Amino acid sequence: GVERLDRVDHEFVNVHVGDRTIPALLAAVPEATAVTLSWRLFGNDGVVDYVDEPLTETFTRAAPHVLHWPWRALLFKTLVRNDGSYGKLGVHRPRAPDEARLAGQRWVDGSGRVLPAAFHRGRIFLDPGRDSHALVQLNHYPLGAVQSFVLKRDRGRAVHAEGGLDAGYWVERNFIDEEDRSILALDSRVLRDGLRGDRVLGPLHQAAVDWRHRRFRTLMQEDAWRSFYGQLRMAGPTRVLSQAEAESIWKPYIRG
């Protein structure tokens, strides 16, 4: 189980220091007990059809490193030392902190900056207007191809029952302002070929690919799903808001 692991994380970790491995990242911040791996959102970039190719190769345009809105673009996952300071793993961060151990916590962001004590207990997103990707970023592909997003909505969200996978979700994540191919230097072809050639995993993977194509064709028999598909096809890239524009959304209305 995870209890035996030193550190725990998942997703597309993209390290920018040393030999681009997790040990190289930890060597760059040796005193850190936790590193927040800030998302970099990769948008749809006009890809319509689902194809069985790696996300990292298909989607290479992303949000700028500095964003002021939406706050969901500032979410992070956590690479945390598994030393008993927290009793549970959460979706974005460890939970159930041991109060007696918190004084020894040292959290840093993906640029190596020390984060305030509020992060030791409950924060799940970073402050806006800062580049938190100098050492490491988490490549996040929330949309995929248009057909894939239709299937994602059909499936539903794995963690959050509230908040639909609707056009609003799409708009908040469809950033394609900068090209970023940095993760492609970490060649995964040998590993992928090995998995696809596995006598158990290979057929299961192909069955999943075939199912996705069949399911999409089935959904397109219904007017509501065709309408949603059409909405996504008409939607353009998301516009990045300036700091002033972002602050005008919340600053006049939130006190304190």
List each language-model region with its residue ranges:
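Short beta-strand-to-loop acidic/aromatic patch adjacent to the donor-nucleotide binding site
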Residues: G1-N14
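Catalytic-site signature of metal-activated, phosphate-bearing donor transferases
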Residues: V15-L241
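Charge-dense, extended regions
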Residues: P237, A244-R255
